[in-house]
Amino acid sequence: MPTKGILVLTPEGFQFFVFMPPTSNLASLPLRFFSPALDLLPGCLHQRLCPELSDSDWVRLGVQRCLAPQSSGRGFLQTLASLAPSLCPDNSHFFESLKSQRRLDLCAELNAKLCVHARRVLPDALAAFPCLAGFDIHAGDGHYHAHAVHDPADSKGNKHPVGHLYARNLRYGTLSHLTVNDQVTRKKEHDMRGLKRQTIDTLRQGAKKGRKVLYVWERAGIDFNQWHDWKQGSGIYMLSRCKANMALVKCGDLPFERGDAINAGIQSDELVGSGKAGVLLRRVIFIDVLTGITYEYLTNLLQSSVPPGVIAHLYKMRWDIEKSFDEVKNKLGEKKAWASSATAKSMQAQFICLSVNLLQLIEDEIGKEGIVNQAEVKRRAARLEAAQEQAASQNAVLPKTLVMMQQMTQHSVKLIRWVAAQLWLNVPWKAACEVLIALYSKLYGPSIGRHCKHRNLWDSIRLISTPNYTSPALDTIVNTATYGIASA
């Protein structure tokens, strides 16, 4: 029986590497990166046998499309055809597959399974708060992409951006797609209208029976009666901020420990009535000691066992999903819809979520091997130290939650470009990690790549070769990864 392996470009030329288990140092980075998703694929109900473009290849293509520097689908396929022609489908086949409802259902099912897998292996950012042990907690919000090239214009000749609703798990940092905006009757859909279209299973995000779910949403997610119904019938809670025009009636105070540093900045913890809606709510008033700004938070989580300082911090963590959107737009470059159909737009969103979640898993994996972006750690520590000094100068203290919760909210550009480059190169895991260590050890790339748009991606490629080693294959990889073109 022939040995299975892969031909890999190395400093010594092309070498044959035998396929190894995903956890082996000789296994390629693509195998380690994709294995959490591909290992779950056989258990998906929507998987089918497709000889021309298998489901596993489709998942890899979609994720690699998100990570690739090319801004267009055709540019991505041209690069793929240059580097791996056997893996590249026809343009028409790729774009037709984006319209497949079955493949969309598969991607949604796969991402849901991947999020469940992540809960078992990733650290819990909220583990320090036992009062939240019975809750799955998500930050939710809307995010827009620019219209697709072939989207139809309205009667005034305008093309509309594409809106999506996403949820980020605040415990594990995983990203889920809830829905794409109504593409038929409304081009700009209100958040609550989009949420009301979702099933209870979608909103519960795979939470087990008996477990509560809390959504942290900005003011566009307020509908007291709807959240009351979801809370009573399905254990789904909300946390938001008060609107200026709300007529709330104070019904009483909830006791809390003012001397506890976790409640620093809390002015009051109250029960309030929502007037016409007739729903009892909890209002937490908090003053930020660094800015002096007063915030009023509103939730239907009435249990005083959850301190008001934790309520205030959970809303502060809502910013994590905004950081995810910034990563998607500015680091992954996903600014524009891939195609015109609602199915294709939802497919793109699912691939974005898969990409972010696989990055979350691979970053955790390399962190367990001691590979950490120390520059980012030092910057975060410096920001905390500056905040503590500012608070001390005002004879105040920072909330304990802010000091306790010092985790990364985005993946670094270096990590993303490293993964993107290594997916093309297919080098062994240990060699790929050595490249990342070298990238993390310096602030800037080599002078020869200083003016490249994707400088860190160029570095990732350069670091596997010796200074005197060149080849047409390496030239092709450098040109396509950096400029999106193949060598002549």
Where are these regions (language model features)?
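Short, conserved catalytic/metal-binding motifs centered on acidic residues
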Residues: 61, 76-77, 89-95, 135-145, ...
